[in-house]
């Protein structure tokens, strides 16, 4: 269950939130302000108080507004297409923006879900792989972009299936790996 909290103090974009459970430094939370969720990052925790930095204007925020903590740190999405896009500090795709600014509480997905990429397998069925191991590659701006085993994967995996060379979107499953306990993961 996600940790929740209530805004207890606001000084510009620094907000104090009283929490009902565990939170960690650098964890992401969203504070609801008039139906809009504003992203923030925990910068300090003292007892039941989390001190968070909101990434946009806190105009309209009030003591008593609700916050929900995500249980994970600020992350970026890695994948083909990153080298040909323009991002802000939260990896919002600036080319998708209408006008000069994103609307408050609005975030964009950083990669193109519809683009087809020419995939070339580098591993083969039966290979043993681990976090960071190369499964294949796609070319982006004449540079090979490696498709890797996610860095969050622990231990050794066996490649159960792997797509053949061809065109695929970033949302398609490229490989199925089997972990040391026999569990399959995509």
Label each residue range with its predicted role.
Residues 2-3, 18-186:
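Acidic-enriched and Gly/Ser
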Residues 2, 8-11:
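Extreme N-terminal "head/tail" segments of very large remodeling/mechanoenzyme assemblies
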């Amino acid at each position: 269950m996600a940790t929740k909290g209530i805004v207890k103090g606001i000084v510009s974009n620094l907000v104090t939130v009283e929490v009902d459970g565990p939170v960690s430094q650098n964890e992401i939370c969203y504070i609801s302000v008039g139906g809009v969720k504003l992203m923030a990052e925990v910068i300090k925790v003292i007892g039941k108080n989390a001190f968070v930095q909101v990434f946009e204007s806190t105009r309209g925020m009030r003591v008593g507004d609700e916050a929900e903590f995500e249980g994970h740190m600020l992350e970026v999405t890695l994948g083909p297409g990153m080298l040909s896009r323009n991002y802000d500090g939260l990896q919002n795709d600036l080319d998708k923006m209408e006008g000069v600014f994103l609307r408050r509480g609005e975030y964009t997905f950083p990669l193109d879900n519809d683009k087809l990429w020419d995939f070339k397998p580098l591993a083969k069925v039966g290979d043993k792989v681990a976090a960071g191991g190369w499964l294949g590659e796609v070319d982006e701006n004449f540079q090979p972009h490696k498709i890797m085993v996610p860095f969050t994967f622990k231990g050794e995996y066996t490649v159960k299936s792997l797509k053949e060379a061809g065109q695929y979107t970033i949302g398609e499953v490229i490989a199925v790996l089997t972990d040391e306990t026999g569990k399959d993961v995509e």
